[in-house]
Amino acid sequence: MSTPQIDVAYIAKLARIDLTEEETALFSKDLDKVLAYITKLESYDVTGIAPMNHPLPAMDVMREDIPETGFTQEEALSNAPQQSQGQFRTPKVVESA
């Protein structure tokens, strides 16, 4: 499959890339190789093969999510330097307007 040089020149023009004649010829050959590879891939029979995103099977490396009981409110507030109405009390960091 051959790709005319005008295609490479047209693509370069659309991308606003200035190519020399040598670069146009080089990219034309490279494009021919890519299209030949695609043609070769199209010849393979892949019926019955499931599509995949990665060649290795995906596995979950995270632990299973098992609910556990946490601290009670009293336990959480037991080491707080200041508390008020069952909540942590902190110094004021935002001034009123």
From Swiss-Prot:
Listed Polar residues bias regions: 70-88
Chain coiled-coil ranges: none
MF (Gene Ontology): asparaginyl-tRNA synthase (glutamine-hydrolyzing) activity; ATP binding; glutaminyl-tRNA synthase (glutamine-hydrolyzing) activity
InterPro entries found in the cross-reference section: Asp/Glu-ADT_sf_sub_c, GatC
Pfam families linked: GatC
TM spans (from-to): none
Reaction it catalyzes: L-glutamyl-tRNA(Gln) + L-glutamine + ATP + H2O = L-glutaminyl-tRNA(Gln) + L-glutamate + ADP + phosphate + H(+); L-aspartyl-tRNA(Asn) + L-glutamine + ATP + H2O = L-asparaginyl-tRNA(Asn) + L-glutamate + ADP + phosphate + 2 H(+)
UniProt EC number: 6.3.5.-
Region (Disordered) residue spans: 68-97
Alphabetized UniProt keyword annotations: ATP-binding, Ligase, Nucleotide-binding, Protein biosynthesis
GO biological process, one term: glutaminyl-tRNAGln biosynthesis via transamidation
Function of the molecule: Allows the formation of correctly charged Asn-tRNA(Asn) or Gln-tRNA(Gln) through the transamidation of misacylated Asp-tRNA(Asn) or Glu-tRNA(Gln) in organisms which lack either or both of asparaginyl-tRNA or glutaminyl-tRNA synthetases. The reaction takes place in the presence of glutamine and ATP through an activated phospho-Asp-tRNA(Asn) or phospho-Glu-tRNA(Gln).
Family (UniProt): Belongs to the GatC family.
Assembly, per entry: Heterotrimer of A, B and C subunits.
Protein name listed in UniProt: Aspartyl/glutamyl-tRNA(Asn/Gln) amidotransferase subunit C
